[in-house]
Swiss-Prot record:
EC number: 2.7.1.50
Entry-linked CDD domains: THZ_kinase
Reactions that this protein is recorded to catalyse: 5-(2-hydroxyethyl)-4-methylthiazole + ATP = 4-methyl-5-(2-phosphooxyethyl)-thiazole + ADP + H(+)
Source organism (scientific name): Haloquadratum walsbyi (strain DSM 16790 / HBSQ001)
Protein name: Hydroxyethylthiazole kinase
Gene responsible for this protein: thiM
Function noted in UniProt: Catalyzes the phosphorylation of the hydroxyl group of 4-methyl-5-beta-hydroxyethylthiazole (THZ).
Biological process, per Gene Ontology: thiamine biosynthetic process; thiamine diphosphate biosynthetic process
Length: 288
């Protein structure tokens, strides 16, 4: 692990604080092609982290829109032929205009079509960060993945090794979400113990994490730093919401609103008060 990566892990708290300050100073424009189910949540989470969301998926304007953006999110939740081509167009524009590119391969492994589209997007485009659940990440490297609909089921004991293999295959930083989150490069992986089980009661938290990472990619130069600090910030917002720090909630529906409030209210001072550094650990793993 090189010196820069060691510093990033050992100083996660201060790095996350710095990332939030950078977002507030830059207000990155993020073009998100996301699914019909979660478009509102994704737009709001981008806004609450300090970004400016725009949800264009029209191929007639995507090059122009992405040219103006600092980051682009491609979410496969409601994949279609026209949607696939829109994502290809947006992804190519992101590379041409040096915008951060985040791919959420929703449902990869569930059907042959989704697996094919995910493989095309992840290997043809110059993706900076891939954000998926355990099953989706496994599917991208050809492993048997238990994905039912768009949800990952079953056990994934080799999640870190699989994430590293995915990073090598796609040349992207990989975020593999689960009970704990894995952030991987082609050389190593890190386990993040952040978040709350209440996040699992909502449809769309993975999409919201993707929107978070896209916002951080828009405000930061380094994809690994953006993936790590974005995942930490989203997890801590989920914890703060579950702990009642942003108001009481009666169940999943009101908890979702509280998560958005927590994202809007998460600032460097709040991060400074949380012991994060011992909850981010390097996983000693080699690709399979």
């Amino acid at each position: 692990m090189n010196e820069d990566t060691t510093t990033l892990v050992e100083e996660t708290n201060t790095t996350t604080q710095a990332a939030l300050r950078q977002l507030s100073q830059t207000t990155p424009l993020v073009n998100a092609i996301t699914n019909d189910v979660t478009v509102n949540q994704v737009a709001n989470i981008i806004l609450h982290w300090g970004g400016l969301p725009v949800m264009s998926d029209d191929v007639r304007e995507l090059d122009e829109m992405v040219n103006a953006a600092e980051a682009c999110l491609l979410n496969m939740g409601t994949v279609s032929e026209t949607g696939e081509e829109a994502m290809m167009t947006a992804g190519q524009a992101a590379s041409e205009h040096d915008a951060g590119l985040v791919l959420d391969p929703v449902g990869a492994g569930a059907t042959a079509t989704r697996s094919r589209v995910a493989e095309r997007l992840s290997t043809t485009l110059d993706v900076d960060v891939i954000n998926g659940n355990r099953g989706e990440v496994a599917a991208l490297v050809g492993e048997d993945a238990e994905v039912r609909g768009v949800e990952s089921v079953g056990e994934h004991p080799d999640a870190a090794e699989t994430a590293i293999a995915c990073a090598q295959h796609t040349e992207a930083v990989v975020v593999s979400s689960g009970v704990t989150d894995i952030v991987a490069t082609a050389e190593t992986a890190f386990e993040l113990n952040v978040g709350d089980e209440m996040l699992g009661t909502l449809v769309g938290t993975g999409c919201m994490l993707g929107g978070t990472i896209a916002a951080f990619c828009g405000g930061l130069d380094d994809p690994l730093t953006a993936a790590l600090t974005g995942t930490v910030a989203f997890g801590l917002a989920g914890e703060a919401a579950a702990n009642g720090e942003f108001g009481e909630y009666a169940g999943p529906a009101s908890y979702e609103t509280t998560v958005l409030d927590a994202a809007a209210g998460t600032d460097p001072e709040m991060i400074a008060a949380v012991d994060i550094d011992n909850r981010v650990n390097r996983v000693l793993a080699e690709a399979k």
